[in-house]
């Protein structure tokens, strides 16, 4: 299906249409409140949060989800879709089976040393590279999980206006985290991106908002061997508040969409930190409050330093504006470099397409320091040295 909305995002319909479609789903996930929190930060870039009721271990509680965007409606829909995909990823006993028919090699999931490899619960997925069903551990699908195989995470969870859109965006997130992990392992990240030649006016608009607020943005190129742009946006705040030393990373076939995602991710990181509701924000505040701003910058200096510069026009752009063609390009690239499976599990629970995508052998070090493959350092060497 053709991509129709491509200025602020890359979707088959506008965020206004999406918001209208998901109203029933928002009721089903027990949405309590959807609110704009951009007023908490000086950069004036839209960030929303969605609050919903949850039951954990028989006790009622609240879950918070954040959304980002270059405009108000996009940020609002982003928060809603994240909430829907998280609800959809909750444990579903109807999908679980004890005996796999075609089990994945669990070692390909890059396991921590503490992993219990005696997997007792499996879920059937579809491998769209080899066009076959394949069984994956339940811990790799649902969130939250038992954590016996590895710590639960949301990497590769996505929702969309249709199944292919959800698969595409989940896949791009996995490629993003893989590239980010390799950058984390590298001693230097040498290439800065010059955004002056950006054709998308929203890029200039967002950077101008940061500059007016006294926040310098540095864009770094993290693109790996797949030639799918991965961009990091690093914020250097003149207020020198350690909490505002944030990084946002975006990945997309179109470099300008990758840049937009990175820029809006920084805004979301800042606003959610100031909102301070979630446990991860509180832990980060506790940690960073003990370290002076300039020292934090020195610790993370590879993100600020650079040796060369490229223009956006120099970056690969393989966006086909067609979901099937986009996915085919990605599948071909993955296969070319030895990543021979792209698996998705359909998680649709509330009438909105949601998936968990799993790409075996992809790095997740940036979100789980206990999981690192031997191959990672070879890839870092080729990319950065």
From Swiss-Prot:
A Pfam family (short name) is YcaO
Query: What PROSITE patterns has UniProt attached to this entry?
Result: YCAO
The YcaO domain is annotated at 67-385
Family matches, as InterPro entries: Methan_mark_1 (IPR017667), YcaO-like_dom (IPR003776)
Family annotation (PANTHER family) = RIBOSOMAL PROTEIN S12 METHYLTHIOTRANSFERASE ACCESSORY FACTOR YCAO
Signal sequence interval, chain numbering = none
Q: What is this protein called?
A: Uncharacterized protein MJ1094
Give the matching NCBIfam families. methan_mark_1 (TIGR03266), YcaO-type kinase domain (TIGR00702)
